[in-house]
Swiss-Prot record:
Protein name as it appears in the record: Cytochrome P450 monooxygenase 103
GO cellular component: membrane
Keyword Hydrolase assigned: no
Family annotation (SUPFAM superfamilies): Cytochrome P450
Originating organism: Postia placenta (strain ATCC 44394 / Madison 698-R)
Cited function: Cytochrome P450 monooxygenase that is able to use testosterone as a substrate for oxidation.
Amino acid sequence: MASTPLLYVLVIILSAVYLLRRRSNPLYAIPAVGPSLPLLSYIGALRFTRHAHEMLQEGYIKYKGSAFRLAQLDRWVVVLCGPKMNEELQRMPDDQVSFLDAAEDLVQTKYTIAKNVIENPIHISVMRGPLTRNLAPLLLDVIDEINIGVEEHIPTRGDEWVSVPGLATMTQIVSRASNRVFVGLPMCRDPEYFKIISNFPRDVAKGRFILSITPTFLKPIIGPLLPWSRRTVRQYSALMKPIIEERQRLLLEHRDPHDPDRPNDFMTWLIEEGRAVDQPVDLLVNALLSSNFVAIHTSSISVTHALYNLAAYPEYQQPVRDELVEVIKAEGWTKQAFGKMWKLDSFMRESQRMFGISAISVIRKALKDVTLSNGTVIPAGTLIAVAAEGTHYDEGSYDNPYIFNPFRFSDMREDEGERIKHQYVSTSSEYVSFGHGKHACPGRFFASNELKAILSRLILDFDMKFGGDGHRPPNQWFGSSIIPSQTANVMFRKRPDAGL
């Protein structure tokens, strides 16, 4: 019994030390949205998984021009609010805040994908370099795959309306078009291949959730035991490793870059990038899988948001269609043509402004203490993000931001000085869907052309609408992720003048 008072004293001392350390930590001087006291913050973290929209909106309204913090199950995230703060974050140097370290913390890449991809992200270099430079010659294959995919997955009959699952159909078409570039024929059409790459984001999410509730000291033990991603990586490797090795042999036989028999595609560029840093085939396999993880997940969501807006606002289909007919008759199905599709470009940008893939963006990890211009101190090791949804609905940046105005940005581009700033792929402190600054999404130029090709084909070939009352179904939120309805169907009817 004598030990009981000693135990009480020890608890009091430890509590006092904890509270003193907490008080001295500048993180806790930043206002919180949701409960912030020890243990109670976990209630806030759980609430965020279901009510992120409301919590982020509350924080943006209260703290615009400054910052607030949000509890996650395994950490606090500091969210910056407003264009001025967005610009401040993207200007911070890489030795102060890190994009790759933030990605590793968020996704736990070394456990959920592969350690070598975060250490040698060769796929990012390929997306930023040869993929972007070769968009024009790649487009013919992409368009061909889209045309075949649309015929297979939207099986219309005469002038009848047919009902097609929106998100699932767009995911199929995006996957085929992207992988026509990533892995080529016939693998891009292989059902087993599609099953593996479409399951992978869910496998990563399951592993990420388990690790988010795992104490830090146990992650090196629990992480390697997670079965889902490891199983998918094995399956993907079994399919792709022989193909990559065969491609390596082919490239050795055709060393001359001007040789017409030398493939010029994503796999070739990955192999060349891997050779430059002397990396094994396993890295190439994981880099291909990671490219699918990033490209297909985000592009499928973005194009589905745009499709749902076309179906919910059918009155805008004809103005876009008229522009498409005029441009394609003059330029053909080319990169130059896609650059002149201002109305379609604006429609896509407005869809992404109002219906992004995430309510936060420009995510970084502080490598050292960060002091903002307003004096707020963010300690080293903290994740920092900007409030993307708040930014995109800010009345200081957009007139009537809650109204879908599909030609908002094409109208802005009528001013010659604004033509580049308001393109779909352009980023700014007021538009952060692709991030902002030098770490903005490197694949957005490929994605822009791919999505324009898909939407152009749909608009030219079909009338589209929702059944019932015709209203767009509500989005589904998973934390800060914004997913278009996974159960909604879109009605398609073949147009009599289809086939341009």
